[in-house]
Amino acid sequence: MKFELDTTDGRARRGRLVFERGTVETPAFMPVGTYGTVKGMTPEEVRATGADILLGNTFHLWLRPGEEIMRKHGDLHDFMNWQRPILTDSGGFQVFSLGDIRKITEEGVHFRSPINGEKIFMDAEKSMQIQYSLGSDVVMIFDECTPYPATHDEARKSMQMSLRWAQRSRDEFDRLENPNSLFGIIQGSVYEDLRDESLKGLLEIGYDGYAVGGLAVGEPKEDMHRILEHVCPQIPADKPRYLMGVGKPEDLVEGVRRGVDMFDCVMPTRNARNGHLFTSEGVIKIRNARHRDDTSPLDAKCDCYTCKNYSRAYLYHLDRCNEILGARLNTIHNLRYYQMLMEGLRGAIETGTLDAFVEEFYTSQGREVPKLSD
């Protein structure tokens, strides 16, 4: 992978990630394909929304279908018929989300399978091996996602263990002679000094890109913005910056304003299945009865298949009847909305008009523009 930085507007960056399997224009949003599929969508449909890269989930793909079946197909690209770049998370976040059915030690994590209760162990080395089997274009290190809230001491211990796991991830990645890219993950909760220590340690090890982890886990938005403003300028300019698990459209806008290059989140797809649709004028809840006889499209400014062909009334009807097509059309729209937002952000950075773009984004939704720190 090669990262090319074209231009900046304030702290925002316009560039691209160049892989053998294709180029990803940045800032980029990655739809989430947890089980090797973006729910309800074919790869062709996902691509038609403008997505250049997908995120796959190491933990879930390891449990089902497993490495052996994956290898029989070649890798995850062949298994799901997506021949463009794929980033896989390390599995750490999912393991730590298991709560009472897992035990964390220095070696790794012991847990019971949420599928059948089987005892399983995952560590940094196993995570690297699974992601190697998946053929991931971007591999993420195995880390502990520090829960929120955490005291300074709790966050420090968690971050320092993540650093030790980061070195083990690097060593195993190199031992496997994996030709793809490895990203480090900056931890430290909401504490700037711990974020500094984490980044310093990761830079000493050396990675192809750097993610900011442990945000959007319940902390106030002000803390997320503060940490991004503190951390992003310290990441080398020639390395991509990835904000993990984020988020709402405004979170993407605020992340880009603070120098983030990559995002992922289940929100556009999950919300689509629940009838929450993102538009240029804010969120539409298609289950609301006021859409029952509305012949207008979801969003007159959207060029997606759904908006070009169907009315709000039809989408309301599909939702009320619990028709699968409704969830699919909603997903197509939400994913396209996210990609159009990223296209708009990239264009604004190119032309030096990001401030105007951001103001229009918030004004159209009747909201004020959040302030950046000096």
UniProtKB/Swiss-Prot annotation:
Highest taxon above the source species: Bacteria
Residue numbers spanned by region RNA binding: 245-251, 269-273
Pfam families: TGT (PF01702)
Transmembrane segments: none
Signal peptide: none
Pathway assigned to this chain's UniProt record: tRNA modification; tRNA-queuosine biosynthesis
InterPro entries linked: ArchSynthase1/Queuine_TRR (IPR050076), TGT (IPR004803), TGT-like_sf (IPR036511), tRNA_ribo_trans-like (IPR002616)
Reaction equation(s) it catalyzes: 7-aminomethyl-7-carbaguanine + guanosine(34) in tRNA = 7-aminomethyl-7-carbaguanosine(34) in tRNA + guanine
Binding-site residues, substrate: 89-93, 143, 187, 214
Record-linked HAMAP family: Q_tRNA_Tgt
Similarity field: Belongs to the queuine tRNA-ribosyltransferase family.
Protein name as it appears in the record: Queuine tRNA-ribosyltransferase
Gene source species: Shewanella loihica (strain ATCC BAA-1088 / PV-4)
